């Protein structure tokens, strides 16, 4: 039996089957993208709910795996050379799983196109949408200074325009369905939660809307959106 006791996180979130990949996450866009990838791959894994509370993400056990105190993180008991490996950062996890299985990243030009759009999401779409959500829906909503809100709403509009142009003639950003789509689309879906579709001009981006609909039609996506359960 695989022994994961060297990973301190397993003391707080104990694995039922240590031979399975362990997912430590919560169903936010960054968490969803990894759960969706695991569902698409059909890999056996064990999800552990890590809430966004300090009691979880700032616990010594979680920090031992991710010193940046953010979900998601994984332990793969069958890592390189057959040895367990722990990883954090959703983009890195997606690339690791794609390379491990040889799926959803492509080869040659498509591989680099996939990496390009994955990095676009990690560096732009996710951070800008997240900050916009803070200022239009969450704790920053009550801040009187309009400039932060205007800044992030404006950047969200710009990024939607970039994606709208990219999708001209494409169903998926890298040609074939890939980890880049798994990274991008959950953040588009978050606009509903932020109640921000109207302010970013969603209806003016029909290709983006159709792209999100295609993504949400996938059975693995529907499963992954709710893993781990919020309950």
Predicted regions and their residues:
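Residue-level recognition of oxygen-bearing side chains
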Residues: 92, 207, 220
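GST-like domain detector, emphasizing the conserved glutathione-binding G-site
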Residues: 1-147
């Amino acid at each position: 039996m695989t022994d994961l006791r060297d990973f301190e996180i397993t003391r707080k979130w104990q694995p039922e089957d240590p031979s399975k990949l362990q997912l430590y996450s919560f169903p936010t866009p960054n968490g969803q993208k990894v759960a969706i990838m695991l569902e698409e791959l059909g890999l056996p894994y064990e999800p552990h709910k890590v809430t966004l509370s300090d009691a979880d993400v700032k616990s010594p056990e979680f920090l031992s795996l991710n010193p940046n105190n953010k979900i998601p993180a994984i332990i793969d008991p069958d890592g390189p050379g057959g040895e367990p490996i722990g990883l954090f950062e959703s983009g890195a996890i997606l690339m690791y799983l794609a390379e491990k299985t040889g799926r959803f990243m492509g080869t040659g030009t498509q591989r680099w196109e996939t990496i390009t759009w994955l990095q676009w999401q990690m560096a732009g779409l996710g951070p800008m949408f997240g900050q916009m959500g803070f200022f239009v829906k969450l704790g920053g909503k009550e801040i009187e200074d309009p400039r932060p809100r205007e800044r992030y709403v404006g950047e969200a509009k710009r990024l939607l325009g970039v994606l709208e142009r990219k999708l001209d003639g494409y169903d998926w950003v890298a040609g074939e369905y890939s980890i880049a789509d798994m990274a991008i689309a959950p953040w588009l879906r978050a606009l509903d939660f932020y109640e921000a579709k109207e302010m970013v001009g969603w209806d003016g981006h029909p290709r983006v809307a159709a792209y999100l609909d295609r993504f949400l039609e996938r059975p693995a996506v529907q499963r992954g959106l709710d893993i781990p359960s919020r309950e």
